[in-house]
């Protein structure tokens, strides 16, 4: 007979890497073209004037300028704009 009980195993021990999502540049900040404004899953924020969208829904500036956020339309979509400097 065994003198000690078996140690057993655990089903824990896994965790995914952080994805660093969220707003990176806030309203009023001055940014350069190509700067990431928002990293997101899906379109919580929609691209507005002078803002591009990547295949992972990242919003980025197309021109140098100042960031502004707005709520538009009957569906209250949150949009991000960059006014050229």
Swiss-Prot record:
Residues 1-21 are annotated as: Disordered. Pfam families: Ribosomal_L27 (PF01016). Residues 1-10 have a biased composition (Gly residues). One of its GO terms (cellular component) is cytosolic large ribosomal subunit. Keywords: Ribonucleoprotein, Ribosomal protein. Gene3D superfamilies: 2.40.50.100. InterPro entries: Ribosomal_bL27 (IPR001684), Ribosomal_bL27_CS (IPR018261). One of its GO terms (molecular function) is structural constituent of ribosome. NCBIfam families: L27. Belongs to the bacterial ribosomal protein bL27 family. This is Large ribosomal subunit protein bL27.
